[in-house]
């Protein structure tokens, strides 16, 4: 069984696929979208940026479908958390059956710390 984790960050959107039995990293991909440029300058995602993000996440979801990955985690961090229109993004993604979890700053720090300490080859 495999699991996938998608990290939607300020500079890039990354996914990692792990073997759930031994947490060995199987695949990694990074796409620079620079979401922070919109959010930190204008307070929200521009519609063009949001559409690029939605299309990318749909592409990732399609990849996970082809690889028969059932356990998928789409995680939004700082840029999504700080965006004034993150609720619209969540709604649009829900319409595509993509469940986005937006982490608080404290949750993000705690999760990344434990993830990097507990799972080999996760950095």
Outline where the language-model segments fall:
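Nucleotide/phosphate-binding catalytic cleft detector across ATP-hydrolyzing
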Residues: 1-10, 16-123
């Amino acid at each position: 069984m495999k699991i996938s984790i998608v990290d939607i960050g300020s500079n890039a959107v990354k996914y990692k696929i792990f073997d759930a039995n031994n947490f060995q990293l199987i695949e990694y991909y990074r796409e620079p979208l620079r979401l922070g440029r919109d959010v930190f300058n204008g307070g929200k995602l521009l519609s063009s940026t949001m559409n690029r993000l939605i299309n990318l996440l749909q592409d990732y979801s399609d990849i996970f479908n082809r690889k028969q990955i059932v356990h998928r985690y789409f995680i939004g961090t700082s840029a999504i958390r700080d965006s004034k229109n993150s609720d619209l993004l969540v709604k649009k993604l829900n319409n595509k059956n993509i469940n986005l979890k937006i982490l608080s700053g404290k949750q993000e720090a705690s999760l990344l710390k434990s993830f990097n300490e507990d799972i080999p080859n996760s950095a």
